[in-house]
Amino acid sequence: MHKFNFMDEILKQFPNLSDNQRAQFAKLHDLYVEWNAKINVISRKDIDELYTRHVLRSLGIAKIMEFQPGASVMDVGTGGGFPGIPLAILFPETQFYLIDVIAKKIRVVNEVAAGLGLTNVKAEQMRAE
């Protein structure tokens, strides 16, 4: 599914997205392709299916749970930032804490979040024990 088809699907599921959120979701693919070429955090076969295998599945959480403004959500073992990054776009007034033990993954998460202008994401390398 190309990003344009994905945008049609996401707008069907979430029709009230702001222009900024639409732009962030559209930019997500290019940022992950760029960073995945430098630091392999998503399987090379999965990067072509980023929206269907990672983004849409992450957003499925929003169909059963709505995060309230001012709430804090922790994504333990975030890997490349899923489900945290897509949910942070969808819920800009909710704070998301993404943690993973692998430093290169957290670097990508921080770079993608910065590239999208997400101010509600904090990612750190740590163990969750």
Could you describe each region identified by the protein language model?
Residues 1-69, 74, 111-121:
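Class I SAM-dependent transferase core
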Residues 59-129:
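Conserved SAM/SAH cofactor-binding pocket of Class I
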